[in-house]
């Protein structure tokens, strides 16, 4: 007669901690680089900052949402500033190029925060995509 094999563990998964803290605990520790490129993408709803090395490999990224801002507060200039400070402090940059894309309200605040942080900026480039009379824009909102 066959002997029953005892089960180790159960099928139910036990959730440890809260859901909102799960993202921060899963994040890898960022590589520390001295020279890199800071990409600032400022939309009307959010500000996303990506730090890459000179070859273009992503080292760290941060957005207003990951810094703790929700809903319409993500679009504020203060959220853009906090996002920029968070991204630079984590990586420890000394020299950088800045690529700015978009026309959101966090754009200037993020740029000001990067300049004040002590990082030497070699160039600031605006890479906002501009159509050469391409697609028809959406109709204006009527509120």
UniProtKB/Swiss-Prot annotation:
Subcellular location: Plastid, Chloroplast
Major subcellular location class: plastid
Keyword Nucleotide-binding in record: no
PROSITE patterns: RIBOSOMAL_S11
InterPro entries, alphabetized: Ribosomal_uS11 (IPR001971), Ribosomal_uS11_CS (IPR018102), Ribosomal_uS11_sf (IPR036967)
Domain of life: Eukaryota
BP GO annotations: translation
Pfam family of the protein (one): Ribosomal_S11
Record's keyword terms, sorted: Chloroplast, Plastid, Ribonucleoprotein, Ribosomal protein, RNA-binding, rRNA-binding
Presence of keyword rRNA-binding: yes
Any one GO CC term of the record: ribosome
GO MF term set: rRNA binding; structural constituent of ribosome
Subunit annotation: Part of the 30S ribosomal subunit.
HAMAP family the record matches: Ribosomal_uS11
Recorded family membership: Belongs to the universal ribosomal protein uS11 family.
Name the record gives this protein: Small ribosomal subunit protein uS11c
Source organism (scientific name): Brachypodium distachyon (Purple false brome)
């Amino acid at each position: 007669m066959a002997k029953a094999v005892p089960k180790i563990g159960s099928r139910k998964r036990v959730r440890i901690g809260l859901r909102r803290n799960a993202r921060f605990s899963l994040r890898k520790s960022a590589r520390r680089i001295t020279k890199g490129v800071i990409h600032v993408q400022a939309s009307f709803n959010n500000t996303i900052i990506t730090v890459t090395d000179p070859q273009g490999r992503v080292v760290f990224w941060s957005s207003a949402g990951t810094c703790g801002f929700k809903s319409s507060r993500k679009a504020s200039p203060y959220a853009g500033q906090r996002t920029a400070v968070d991204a630079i402090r984590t990586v420890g940059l000394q020299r950088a190029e800045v690529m700015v894309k978009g026309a959101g309200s966090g754009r200037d605040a993020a740029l000001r925060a990067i300049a004040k942080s002590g990082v030497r900026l070699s160039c600031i480039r605006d890479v906002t995509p501009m159509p050469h009379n391409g697609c028809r824009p959406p109709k204006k909102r009527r509120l």
